[in-house]
Amino acid sequence: MTDRVSAGNLRVARVLYDFVNNEALPGTDIDQDSFWAGVDKVVTDLTPQNQDLLKTRDDLQAQIDKWHRHRVIEPLDPQAYREFLTEIGYLLPAPEDFTITTSGVDDEITTTAGPQLVVPILNARFALNAANARWGSLYDALYGTDVISESDGAEKGRGYNKVRGDKVIAYARQFLDDSVPLAGASYTDATGFKVEDGQLVVSLADTSAALADPGQFAGYTGTAENPKSILLANHGLHIEILIDPESQIGATDGAGVKDVILESAITTIMDFEDSVAAVDADDKALGYRNWLGLNRGDLSEDVTKDDKTFTRVLNTDRTYTAPHGGELTLPGRSLLFVRNVGHLMTNDAIVSDAEGAEGAPVFEGIMDALFTGLIAIHGLRSTDANGLLTNSRTGSIYIVKPKMHGPAEVAFTCELFSRVEDVLGLPQGTMKVGIMDEERRTTLNLKACIKAAADRVVFINTGFLDRTGDEIHTSMEAGPMIRKGAMKNTAWIKAYEDANVDTGLAAGFSGKAQIGKGMWAMTELMADMVEQKIAQPKAGATTAWVPSPTAATLHAMHYHKVDVFAVQKELQGKTRTSVDELLTIPLAKELAWAPEEIREEVDNNCQSILGYVVRWIDQGVGCSKVPDIHNVALMEDRATLRISSQLLANWLRHGVITSEDVRASLERMAPLVDKQNAGDPEYHAMAPNFDDSIAFLAAQDLILSGAQQPNGYTEPILHRRRRELKARAGA
């Protein structure tokens, strides 16, 4: 039984109530009683609107399902389909042209293009690593990944391999030549660095060279005659060359260079949503406490490596001597967003006894806005009471709002933020919104969605996986879908990615707000990432998601190769897609799959689902590196789970597979997943007692009940089954 404290119409779990009163409120100048009165009023006033928005989702889906079931024209008539969606209010008229007016936004969002990390807020170590990933070692990123081949004696091994190290140095030198070139010379031939008359001078064997563009020299540390580091800038990002001839690496380098540091994760999203398993008050309080530590600057974590333990803390800012003297200070940490949950889920960390509520759990998205907003106040001030580190330098709080369906839901988010600002005593417009373009109704009405948040929006971002999950679920009754691996090559995907950029640019995003693109999920395949992910900045995206600090450093190289703002200038004014392209449903043209192909698809998806769900349910891990059926490590979160479960639910609905096929595949794949997790002492095997494994049953539910889940979301089943396991463990 949860211990609760009454606050007006609300009954708040004591663990959350005490955290807010004793840890979050002190230093904010907000009175405890007035805060909880404000929470009560916001929850009571806005809950009916939230419920109405969810009813609209269900009503529209029911009408679309009915239309597909009863349509007589085959194949689908695009004009009739478009007219139907317009008639029911799913497809809305586009507003007149406009320009966003958001103000008080940090440079990391407006004028700097670079990588964006997303990390689970429940893991303090991950959160610290991500916040500190603003700067990363290129040498380490190259040496430790497959970007540098292990052929010709360049194996990683246990100790330092000079053959591999030399390849790393050569790669980094080429990067410098490409990004911050010397006039008539190469960094490969450098023998030293110094500063003369505010200019960088690079010594060569018999002469010296300057930068081809002297304006790329940004500063240094040490003395002008004997600098310890050289700071360079390109496309708004910084590169720092570290010099130490006495170090292990510097001693082998002709110029004494020991490392090249890249400005990497410019922004980071601290995630309360798809990458976490937060199902009750204890989980929410842990997430809020970590968010508080990040904003106060006092979050820390003891880390043990090679039998040595140290305490990881947040980095301070970095100070350099400017080229002509004086001090230059650069941020030492990534600018932090926080991703709240969407409009769907409730959480009984707070229950409401307001009229008609009868003890119902409160909408979690409303809770998140109130509590993450409150906590973020600490990140706006540098005082003894708030901590000495700040997040925003312009007085803004950045909240990513996921899984919104259409402009009415965006408008509701803006109303929620406005009400929260009133409770917190913040100026209107302090709480900025990042709009995830990951639901079909938002994609089709993106211009109207942006218009609804024109004075708050700071980013739009595509999310291929969730968007595909919604694509499948919306058209669940239309027929069987193509295989998961083929989705990336469909007409609607290209139209979706292009339309997001075009719409953002038309609304004045360039130089004012981020246009983002999705995650690289193959965490170990960094050579492939370096080769392929450059397509995102080339497409006009000012940021794109990466799965680790190492990946952020490697992806940062792409923004040195591509001037994203120049690309945006070329794309400005273009409309490269049509509504009909966006409405192209990825249906299989004919069911020509061989039985072994169907079995392969089912096994692949069942293995992926089990591999993620077993850690979610049994260990409360919401974001995992899950080996696929071929043992390739993939970054999995609820978005990947949504597409896998929805595809199988679709095939089940249309008779491509049976429930017996699903069960047989799950039973085949569970022992494989058990084997892949054999090295984890906390792991509980699913085989052979499948029906005793709550995780196994959750995976089965997600497929067999997938067609009935709201918009294909996985949270309702996951939360119910995780709470069931917690109850069993506590019994």
UniProtKB/Swiss-Prot annotation:
<dbReference type="InterPro" id="IPR001465">
    <property type="entry name" value="Malate_synthase_TIM"/>
</dbReference>
<keyword id="KW-0816">Tricarboxylic acid cycle</keyword>
<dbReference type="GO" id="GO:0009436">
    <property type="term" value="P:glyoxylate catabolic process"/>
</dbReference>
<feature type="modified residue" description="Cysteine sulfenic acid (-SOH)">
    <location>
        <position position="623"/>
    </location>
</feature>
<feature type="binding site">
    <location>
        <position position="547"/>
    </location>
    <ligand>
        <name>acetyl-CoA</name>
    </ligand>
</feature>
<feature type="active site" description="Proton donor">
    <location>
        <position position="637"/>
    </location>
</feature>
<feature type="binding site">
    <location>
        <position position="466"/>
    </location>
    <ligand>
        <name>Mg(2+)</name>
    </ligand>
</feature>
<feature type="binding site">
    <location>
        <position position="275"/>
    </location>
    <ligand>
        <name>acetyl-CoA</name>
    </ligand>
</feature>
<dbReference type="GO" id="GO:0005829">
    <property type="term" value="C:cytosol"/>
</dbReference>
<feature type="binding site">
    <location>
        <position position="312"/>
    </location>
    <ligand>
        <name>acetyl-CoA</name>
    </ligand>
</feature>
<dbReference type="InterPro" id="IPR011076">
    <property type="entry name" value="Malate_synth_sf"/>
</dbReference>
<dbReference type="InterPro" id="IPR006253">
    <property type="entry name" value="Malate_synthG"/>
</dbReference>
<dbReference type="GO" id="GO:0006099">
    <property type="term" value="P:tricarboxylic acid cycle"/>
</dbReference>
<comment type="function">
    <text>Involved in the glycolate utilization. Catalyzes the condensation and subsequent hydrolysis of acetyl-coenzyme A (acetyl-CoA) and glyoxylate to form malate and CoA.</text>
</comment>
<keyword id="KW-0558">Oxidation</keyword>
<keyword id="KW-0460">Magnesium</keyword>
<feature type="binding site">
    <location>
        <position position="438"/>
    </location>
    <ligand>
        <name>glyoxylate</name>
    </ligand>
</feature>
<comment type="pathway">
    <text>Carbohydrate metabolism; glyoxylate cycle; (S)-malate from isocitrate: step 2/2.</text>
</comment>
<keyword id="KW-0329">Glyoxylate bypass</keyword>
<keyword id="KW-0963">Cytoplasm</keyword>
<comment type="similarity">
    <text>Belongs to the malate synthase family. GlcB subfamily.</text>
</comment>
<protein>
    <recommendedName>
        <fullName>Malate synthase G</fullName>
        <ecNumber>2.3.3.9</ecNumber>
    </recommendedName>
</protein>
<dbReference type="Pfam" id="PF01274">
    <property type="entry name" value="MS_TIM-barrel"/>
</dbReference>
<feature type="binding site">
    <location>
        <begin position="463"/>
        <end position="466"/>
    </location>
    <ligand>
        <name>glyoxylate</name>
    </ligand>
</feature>
<dbReference type="GO" id="GO:0000287">
    <property type="term" value="F:magnesium ion binding"/>
</dbReference>
<feature type="binding site">
    <location>
        <begin position="125"/>
        <end position="126"/>
    </location>
    <ligand>
        <name>acetyl-CoA</name>
    </ligand>
</feature>
<dbReference type="InterPro" id="IPR046363">
    <property type="entry name" value="MS_N_TIM-barrel_dom"/>
</dbReference>
<keyword id="KW-0808">Transferase</keyword>
<dbReference type="Pfam" id="PF20658">
    <property type="entry name" value="MSG_insertion"/>
</dbReference>
<dbReference type="Pfam" id="PF20656">
    <property type="entry name" value="MS_N"/>
</dbReference>
<dbReference type="InterPro" id="IPR044856">
    <property type="entry name" value="Malate_synth_C_sf"/>
</dbReference>
<feature type="binding site">
    <location>
        <position position="438"/>
    </location>
    <ligand>
        <name>Mg(2+)</name>
    </ligand>
</feature>
<feature type="active site" description="Proton acceptor">
    <location>
        <position position="339"/>
    </location>
</feature>
<comment type="subunit">
    <text>Monomer.</text>
</comment>
<dbReference type="InterPro" id="IPR048355">
    <property type="entry name" value="MS_C"/>
</dbReference>
<dbReference type="InterPro" id="IPR048357">
    <property type="entry name" value="MSG_insertion"/>
</dbReference>
<dbReference type="Pfam" id="PF20659">
    <property type="entry name" value="MS_C"/>
</dbReference>
<feature type="binding site">
    <location>
        <position position="339"/>
    </location>
    <ligand>
        <name>glyoxylate</name>
    </ligand>
</feature>
<keyword id="KW-0479">Metal-binding</keyword>
<dbReference type="GO" id="GO:0006097">
    <property type="term" value="P:glyoxylate cycle"/>
</dbReference>
<feature type="binding site">
    <location>
        <position position="118"/>
    </location>
    <ligand>
        <name>acetyl-CoA</name>
    </ligand>
</feature>
<dbReference type="InterPro" id="IPR048356">
    <property type="entry name" value="MS_N"/>
</dbReference>
